[in-house]
Amino acid sequence: MTLIKINKVFMNKNFTTQDEVMNFLADQSIVLSISEDRDAVYEKLMEREEESTTGMMDGFAIPHAKDASIKDADIVIVRLNGKVDWKSLDGEGTDFVIALFIPDSEAGTTHLKFLSQVARLLMHKDVTEGLKQAQSAEEIAELLNQKLEEN
């Protein structure tokens, strides 16, 4: 099964704040037909950040939104040209965002499964280095899909 779609991987974005990234993700939730309510998605992304940071280690963040407006569980990836302050666990800036979108109806199951799979992958240096060195959306999607299938 292909979880990561090439059209949902965005390369070399020039955002300077976490809010710009979250607005982009909310906008894309409409463009990519993930949700029917951009503002609800934005609010859920921000509410989750207020609970505790989704900024992990080594420049990665895993923001996520659970909302009734989200049709199917989905993943959107954004690789930034520079670092953005995300209040990450290691205190470093974030330049690689893996956003999860989960329908309310799947909040307990799909949400936790996606989150744990992605978090586990980011603990492997070969994965994080591969993602950072990838030159195209295709390479990122291929690497993540391969690793997700292995787990």
Language-model features, listed with the residues they occupy:
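Cytosolic covalent-transfer regions centered on His/Cys nucleophiles
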Residues: 1-151
